[in-house]
Amino acid sequence: SGNTSLDLENMFLRVGVQAKAVLDPHFQAQVASLLTVNDLVIIFSLSGKTKDTYDSLKIAKKNGAKIIAITNYIHSPIGKSADLVLQTAIEEFLNGGSLAGKISQLYICDLLVHGYEQNNNIDSVELREKVLRSIIDKSIE
């Protein structure tokens, strides 16, 4: 789930949104403590029961941040505490970290980013080209 949050951070960057993926649980709690009603947190937890993630969610919620949870289990502690749950449908625990779980999360991330683009009339082609130009000549001949 942590790697998927990094992917979502990059996806949002390409449409002009400066998002931050925070993987370290202690840093998550610190960041959550500074959030406000103007902030949105997107939480990834296939089980919906990850303690560190849940603890940070509670801190963020206490500060008024809106919470979107991407999880398999809408009735899990994380699912119940979120303002919105986007449900995946993968039995992740069978092999702990399956590609299917990541793909399920990435699909939801793609929908979130495209929804953001549509709702905010974002010219994503122009922004993506701008980002691409920033890295196009990074190879050494």
Give the role of each language-model region.
Residues 1-107, 111-120:
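Glycine-rich phosphate-binding loops that contact phosphosugars or nucleotide phosphates
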